[in-house]
């Protein structure tokens, strides 16, 4: 009997422990689920503290997100909403971990504590919840608190409900002041940024796009350069966040900003002269002729002094070159700080529509910057893009007055001292179409790329792909590509201009109208029956098919 009672006690005790274990297991399991939901960015509860070690989960440490096959169709539909993989973005934590992609020399740099404060201004229009809030969290989690004055979110007339009251409720719970400012009507990036800058309080204004992720140590190097010289405007290295997988890929510290003949921003290799100026130290900032425009920091007072943005420009486009020219020509400095890295989702297409169409807006903006800042070189641009001259570009008197007040240098100074490797040839004999006398067709780059054959097509008189420059170096040039022949009878290809003559040296005879390739001693000829879309090169015969009319343009003296 005693033994039976003892067994009952043991059994009851064991049962209690089993029940207690089950309770604890269920409790912590549910807690983990709560944490997981919170990390994935559901707008409830407080935000997580800065990530100290890599999490486990989709996209952690910047790794790509792979969507299962059964969800591919849904993924494609969701992609159309923002022109990036929204499904992948929503699977990633709002405070995901990222690799430290800085150069080793950057990781040991020490910055003073008394750097200026910054307001981070982020403009958004119908942005995805996950990308917008991931931008905000990355700023908060990876910025020294005493340097981050506030974050200003400027809503450019978004239509999505979750960007209204739910957004305001969410950001109120963050540990840094986050203000949501609303534009009354769709105004575009330029005017929305001006609104954000006007309400900001920091000593420095940092502009970011709404689909960025800041990495460790991103802010201090930017603020340190501005503290060193308040007239220095600084950009981080822009890393790539894949629009397909949200993989985080480090950008290169060996590229800087330039522009092509059509005034489109382009990345080009950092020239040797800039490497020499830095004595080979890649951790030092790169002086860049232009900036991409989406991500940069500027002293708030200096921003006002040099004229903020041109408020006469519409929506987006051209404002980055305009402010770049203005900074350099009016006594400032523009740098890429190689120890600062910020990721950006690069999309292949824009999900937005613009009143009047994108082309019309960009033409107007480019016309304004050309008229105010490019002096006689604006004529070069107008030959490339004659449609620009037909747009109404508004009143520029206040911008011309600003240039006079600031005693800014001419554009020729900018090309000679800041951007001597510009694609714009400063010395040339001819600019325009190159027309074959027999066929009445024109050379055409066909929007082809480096190492592809130059084309020939019916002359259309609209500039663009049919504009070639016969330069003072006797190159036949289209933007940064030159006509090149490496063997007898061709083909005639387009290669990067190397300025070493050789295979890119052409002699034009204004009497015979021939374009003779000096190395091969052959002449440019019309297309052959075998390939009707490319010119040929043959032994010089004096035939009409080897005669070419070059458009000689009378421009103001710029030689």
From Swiss-Prot:
One of its GO terms (molecular function) is carbohydrate binding. InterPro entries: GalNAc-T, Glyco_trans_2-like, Nucleotide-diphossugar_trans, Ricin_B-like_lectins, Ricin_B_lectin. Glycans are attached at residues 95, 552. N-glycosylated, contains two N-linked oligosaccharides. This is Polypeptide N-acetylgalactosaminyltransferase 1. CDD domains: beta-trefoil_Ricin_GALNT1, pp-GalNAc-T. The record marks 141 as: Not glycosylated. Colostrum contains a soluble form. Substrate binds at residues 156, 186, 316, 347, 352. Mn(2+) binds at residues 209, 211, 344. Disulfide bonds join 106-339, 330-408, 442-459, 482-497, 523-540. Its EC number is 2.4.1.41. One of its GO terms (cellular component) is extracellular region. Residues 115-225 are annotated as: Catalytic subdomain A. There are two conserved domains in the glycosyltransferase region: the N-terminal domain (domain A, also called GT1 motif), which is probably involved in manganese coordination and substrate binding and the C-terminal domain (domain B, also called Gal/GalNAc-T motif), which is probably involved in catalytic reaction and UDP-Gal binding. The ricin B-type lectin domain directs the glycopeptide specificity. It is required in the glycopeptide specificity of enzyme activity but not for activity with naked peptide substrates, suggesting that it triggers the catalytic domain to act on GalNAc-glycopeptide substrates. Changing residue 341 to A: Induces a strong decrease in activity. Residues 285-347 are annotated as: Catalytic subdomain B. Pfam families: Glycos_transf_2 (PF00535), Ricin_B_lectin (PF00652).
């Amino acid at each position: 009997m005693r033994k039976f009672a003892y067994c009952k006690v043991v059994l009851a005790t064991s049962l209690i422990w089993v029940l207690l274990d089950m309770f604890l297991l269920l409790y912590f399991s549910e807690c983990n689920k709560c944490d997981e939901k919170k990390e994935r960015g559901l707008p409830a509860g407080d935000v997580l503290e800065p990530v100290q070690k890599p999490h486990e989960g989709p996209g952690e440490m910047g790794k790509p997100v792979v969507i299962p096959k059964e969800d591919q169709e849904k993924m494609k539909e969701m992609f159309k909403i923002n022109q990036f993989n929204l499904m992948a973005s929503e699977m990633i934590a709002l405070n995901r971990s990222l690799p430290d992609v800085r150069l080793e020399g950057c990781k040991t740099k020490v910055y003073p504590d008394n750097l200026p404060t910054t307001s981070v201004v982020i403009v958004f229009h119908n942005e995805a919840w996950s990308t917008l809030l991931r931008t905000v969290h990355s700023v908060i989690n990876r910025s020294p608190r005493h340097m981050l004055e506030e974050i200003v979110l400027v809503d450019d007339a978004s239509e999505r409900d979750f960007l209204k009251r739910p957004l305001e409720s969410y950001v109120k719970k963050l540990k840094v002041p986050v203000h949501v400012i609303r534009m009354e009507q769709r105004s575009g990036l330029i005017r929305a940024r001006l609104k954000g800058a006007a309400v900001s309080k920091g000593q420095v204004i940092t502009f970011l796009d709404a689909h960025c992720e800041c990495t460790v140590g991103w802010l201090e190097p930017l603020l340190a350069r501005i503290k060193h010289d308040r007239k220095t405007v600084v950009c981080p290295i822009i890393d790539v966040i894949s629009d397909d997988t949200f993989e985080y890929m480090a950008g290169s510290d060996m590229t800087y900003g330039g522009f092509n003949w059509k005034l489109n921003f382009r990345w080009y290799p950092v020239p040797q002269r800039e490497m020499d100026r830095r004595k080979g130290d890649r951790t030092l900032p790169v002086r860049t002729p232009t900036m991409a425009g989406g991500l940069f920091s500027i002293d708030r007072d200096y921003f006002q002094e040099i004229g903020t943005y041109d408020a006469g420009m519409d929506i987006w486009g051209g404002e980055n070159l305009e402010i770049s020219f203005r900074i350099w020509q009016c006594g400032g400095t523009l740098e890429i700080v190689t120890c600062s890295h910020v990721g950006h989702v690069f999309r292949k297409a824009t999900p937005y529509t613009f009143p009047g169409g994108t082309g019309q807006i960009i033409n107007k903006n480019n016309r304004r910057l050309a008229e105010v800042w490019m002096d006689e070189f604006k004529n070069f641009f107008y030959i490339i893009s004659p449609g620009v001259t037909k747009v109404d570009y508004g009143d520029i008197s206040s911008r011309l007055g600003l240039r006079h007040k600031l005693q800014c240098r001419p554009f020729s100074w900018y090309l000679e001292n800041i951007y001597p490797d510009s694609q714009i040839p400063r010395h040339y004999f001819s600019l325009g179409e190159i027309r074959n006398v027999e066929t009445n067709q024109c050379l055409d780059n066909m929007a082809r790329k480096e190492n592809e054959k130059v084309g020939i097509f019916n002359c259309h008189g609209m500039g663009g792909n049919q504009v070639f420059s016969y330069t003072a170096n006797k190159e036949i040039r289209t933007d940064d590509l030159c006509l090149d022949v490496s063997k007898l009878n061709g083909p005639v290809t387009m290669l990067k201009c190397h300025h070493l003559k050789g295979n890119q040296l052409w002699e034009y005879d204004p009497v015979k109208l021939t374009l003779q390739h000096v190395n091969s001693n052959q002449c440019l000829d019309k297309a052959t029956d075998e390939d009707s879309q490319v010119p040929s090169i043959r032994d010089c015969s004096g035939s009409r098919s080897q005669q070419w009319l070059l458009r000689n343009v009378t421009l103001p003296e710029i030689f």
